[in-house]
């Protein structure tokens, strides 16, 4: 086990105390990262539908900023690209951090020269220059399921610092990108019903061990493969230095937009963002190595997704694990490929086999029994 890869897991009754305790458990690692630059850029999660419970809580932001200042940060920039400038006030960020050396930047109103184009397999992707140039990047994400990446943890939350026009390539949405506030509840209910139908239909079709993929399903997987490639390229250029996953109140089901609240009461933090996402995935009931973006990140050397190579400080993840409701399309999403590192990383077997493949499998089984 590589003892240098530490991830803090804290379960508590109060969010602010849990975040502070998590930073205390990895204080030396945080101090090393922050003191090297003397400044930090913090990227909170802002819910594009304007819901406070689905955004980074002000206590999480405030406790994080206090920990960064105590670790040697002379200045902190809070940067987000979803919502609008008023979101910082509406969510209580400015009031909570008043008097501290903190500046706020709304990327949704940023000029063209505020973006840096990074090269990806799918073409240039515009990322906030402030984030790309930062020596210490801090990701504040929510524990939630995701309709593209299976889980919307620290690395997928980097979408918030991508240009709005390019973000659509990273997170292709099957529903309108803008929903009026008065329609959010109805849309969430409709999406839940649709999720039940999709979940049941996929489950029924895979009863015999597999099924033929339809044309739309194949095309959807191809789009998700491209999005996963983009996410890998984005993470390579803007990898968080410190990652915090807030699971006090997360989201499950039809995340990251129309899911339902999930109360875990847990905070996960560390200086290896891949390891933090892996531990958060395990707490939510997922095998980290079954999540394509985590396998790819590990293969690219961005971090460690193998739980056996991660030292947990605080609560053992197995003691705070809670099974969440997965996205309705999860049976499809787990088919997204991901290269391993040549070792024992397991790529999940397909749920969906052709009729001919199933017939061959049954024939082989009968032959084995007869022999």
Go through the PLM ranges and name each one.
Residues 2-371:
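Extended, low-polarity segments enriched in aliphatic/aromatic residues
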């Amino acid at each position: 086990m590589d003892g240098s890869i530490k991830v803090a897991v804290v379960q508590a009754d109060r969010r602010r105390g849990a975040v502070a305790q998590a930073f205390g458990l990895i204080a030396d690692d945080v101090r090393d990262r922050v003191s090297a630059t003397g400044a930090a850029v913090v990227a909170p999660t802002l819910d594009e539908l304007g819901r406070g419970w689905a955004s980074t809580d002000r206590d999480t932001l405030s406790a994080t900023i206090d920990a960064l200042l105590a670790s040697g940060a002379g200045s902190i920039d809070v940067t987000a690209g979803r919502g609008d400038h008023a979101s910082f006030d509406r969510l209580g960020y400015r009031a909570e951090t008043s008097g501290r050396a903190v500046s706020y930047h709304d990327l949704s109103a940023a000029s063209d020269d505020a973006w840096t184009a990074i090269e990806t397999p799918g073409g240039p992707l515009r990322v906030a220059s402030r984030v790309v140039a930062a020596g210490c990047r801090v990701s504040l994400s929510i524990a939630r399921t995701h309709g593209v990446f299976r889980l919307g943890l620290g690395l997928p939350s980097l979408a918030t610092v991508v240009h709005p026009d390019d973000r659509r390539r990273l997170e292709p949405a099957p529903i309108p990108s803008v929903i009026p506030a008065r329609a959010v509840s109805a849309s969430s209910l409709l999406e839940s019903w649709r999720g039940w139908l999709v979940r049941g239909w996929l489950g029924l079709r895979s009863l015999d061990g597999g099924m033929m993929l339809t044309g739309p399903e194949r095309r959807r997987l191809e789009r998700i493969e491209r999005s996963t490639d983009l996410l890998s390229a984005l993470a390579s250029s803007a990898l968080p230095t410190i990652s915090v996953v807030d699971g006090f109140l997360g989201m499950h089901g039809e995340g990251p937009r129309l899911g339902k609240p999930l109360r875990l009461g847990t905070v996960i933090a560390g200086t290896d963002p891949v390891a933090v996402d892996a531990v958060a995935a395990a707490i939510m009931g997922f095998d980290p190595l079954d999540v394509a973006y985590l396998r790819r990140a590990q293969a690219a050397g961005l971090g460690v997704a193998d739980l056996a190579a991660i030292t947990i400080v605080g609560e053992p993840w197995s003691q705070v694990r809670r099974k969440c409701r997965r996205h309705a399309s999860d049976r499809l999403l787990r088919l997204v490929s991901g290269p391993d590192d040549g070792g024992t990383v397991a790529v999940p077997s397909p749920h969906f086999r052709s009729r001919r493949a199933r017939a061959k499998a049954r024939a082989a089984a009968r032959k084995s029994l007869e022999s």
